[in-house]
Amino acid sequence: MNLINFSYLNLLFGAGLFSVLESATILNTESDAKKWLTTYNDEAGKYIYDATEAEWNYNTNLTDHNLGISIKKSNDLATFTEQKAIEANKKFVWKNFTDPLLKREFSKITDIGTASLSDEDFQKMSGLNSDLTKIYSTAKVCNKPNDPSGKCYPLDPDLSDIISKSNDLEELTWAWKGWRDASGKHMPDKYDEFVQLLNKAANINGYEDNGDYWRSWYESPTFRKDCEDLWQEIKPFYEQLHAYVRRKLQKKYPQIAFPKEGHIPAHLLGNMWAQSWENIEYLLRPAPDLPSMDITEELVKQNYTALKLFQLSDTFFKSLGLIQMPQPFWEKSMIEKPADRDVVCHASAWDFYNRKDFRIKQCTVVDMHWFMTTHHEMGHIEYYLHYKDQPISFRSGANPGFHEAIADIASLSVATPEYMQSVSLLPNFTDDPNGDLNFLMNQALTKVAFLPFGYLIDQWRWDVFSGDTPRPKYNSKWWHNRCKYQGVYPPVIRSEQDFDAGSKFHVPNNTPYIRYFVAHIIQFQFHEALCKAANNSRPLHRCNIANSKEAGKKLAELMKSGSSIPWPKVLENLTGSEKMSAKSLMAYYKPLIDWPEKRKPRAENWMGGKMSSWIV
């Protein structure tokens, strides 16, 4: 679930529209500006390619040598970026241009992010970012209970496998606590220094703090309120789902004294961060006598490999009439974890900005999770492929959430029983209302369970950036948010010696996270519009757009524009509305929302519940 494939370009380039560099001193025509942009795009593409290639080499082989090259190339890019922004402001009164597209391109070129820092500060910031990412990517947990081998376990696949499959409470607690001790606990001082530098760059560029800068990418003064309104719209559904899951877990683990406030122990939900709950679907199936929707067993039975998962994903996108993966993709992607070196395993999609080199990096395991992840990452590549002919400044999603939503479009179709059966991966599905409920529950455990987590991470970071959450309160505020929004609590006592936010990749890697919350809302708007284009006659949750060239045409039109058009207009072109809305999501899940068992009232109110006993 990660479009931002490397840290330095994420640091360098935002999507904001604010320029703070020198006022123009020489008046040139818009014709001159277009000629200047031609040269700029050629030069920028080369610098970005070099920085991206160096960062790829480091991510796929975590050595000090590769890190040194990567920092050097990112510094070169930062210098180029700053120089060109200054030049653009000196040569052109671009804010007075009459061509809105030309003005938009210049506004992006002159909004340079952390490239505005001094060379010394930029190098310090780059080094801190690399240090934080390396701590995360090389962390291992040792001393597993009842394991005399002395083996140390990395997150992927080992600790993730334990959290997702084990029923042993001692083992689950060991993995949960051990991961946080090995990763986040080593980060807070470095992270605090990193935050100060990010804020310094934001201030130079005219923003109140780095959170203000990140929010500017959505080009809306009401963005924060809009997100809160969306959360309030879907919160009752999440509360119902949470209460149902809690009741089931209480039955499974009677030896645990669940807190009276109504929270769930975070290590019992089948995911290291409790961000999705599909791994405990077997406990939660509305019709438990029917077969599981999990296709892992079938994938293994049919001898699927990582490569075969990628080929199947490529076939799905080709069936829509979209662009197939180019040959360099197959030659250069890292689709399995190497045995001979440390790498950043977190799945990511990469655009090398030369219109021909696009790659995925992930440590694939043959199971349903990676089946879905592969389609997600390839969705990012499709977006790259479709906007590759845009100018450099427009080679991004209409807003950051669009990229993640497009990446998830495939998942809403390939998860359907119809698609699974069409590729012979779900031979025993029962097509009746109970089977439907099982399917929707599985989808909700993946997508609805994620929503508060997708919302809370940047709520926490924005408060860190603004100073509302100072260093001595990092961990207590983190658990305040997790308690308030997710309704989970830690299985062991936490303190300010811990830094549990750092146990999630996107925090040390400095990848903004609110995009995933936005994406998990608007992907259902996209899906509904594409299903209409495909003349779908089934309920929205059973719509499968595979093989629909009309749906593919609509999707391609959206992707081709990149960020050249303000996102509300792009949304309106596809859906008929320029507003983000949860109505399509609620329509998708209506049979599950109306299911009587899930609608049992809950006795507790954990939203905002006390958590003082969990933090010392």
Curated annotation (Swiss-Prot):
Quote the record's activity regulation: Activated by chloride. Inhibited by captopril and lisinopril, and to a lesser extent by delaprilat.
Question: What family does the Swiss-Prot or TrEMBL record give for this protein?
Answer: Belongs to the peptidase M2 family.
Which keywords annotate this record? Carboxypeptidase, Disulfide bond, Glycoprotein, Hydrolase, Metal-binding, Metalloprotease, Protease, Secreted, Signal, Zinc
Signal sequence range: 1-23
Give the active-site positions: E377 (proton acceptor), H506 (proton donor)
Q: What is the UniProt remark on how the cofactor binds and its stoichiometry? A: Binds 1 zinc ion per subunit. Chloride.
**Tissue spec. comment:** Epithelial cells of the midgut.
Subcellular location as annotated: Secreted, Extracellular space
In terms of PANTHER family, this protein maps to:
ANGIOTENSIN-CONVERTING ENZYME
Residues that hold chloride 1 according to the record: R180, W478, R482
Q: Which residues bind Zn(2+)?
A: H376, H380, E404
Name a GO molecular-function annotation.
metallopeptidase activity
Glycan attachment sites: N61, N96, N303, N428, N535, N573
User: Needs which cofactor?
Assistant: Zn(2+); chloride
Query: What residues does chloride 2 bind to?
Result: Y218, R515
Point out the coiled-coil segments of this chain. none
Q: What PROSITE patterns is this protein classified in?
A: PEPTIDASE_M2
Disulphide bonds in the chain: C142-C152, C345-C363, C531-C543
The record's EC number reads 3.4.15.1
Mind telling me what this protein is named? Angiotensin-converting enzyme
Q: Which GO terms describe its biological process?
A: proteolysis
Q: Which domain of life is it from?
A: Eukaryota
For this record, the Gene Ontology CC terms, alphabetical, are: extracellular region; plasma membrane
Under catalytic activity, the entry for this protein gives: Release of a C-terminal dipeptide, oligopeptide-|-Xaa-Yaa, when Xaa is not Pro, and Yaa is neither Asp nor Glu. Thus, conversion of angiotensin I to angiotensin II, with increase in vasoconstrictor activity, but no action on angiotensin II
Q: Which residues form the Peptidase M2 domain?
A: 27-610
State the organism named in the record. Theromyzon tessulatum (Duck leech)
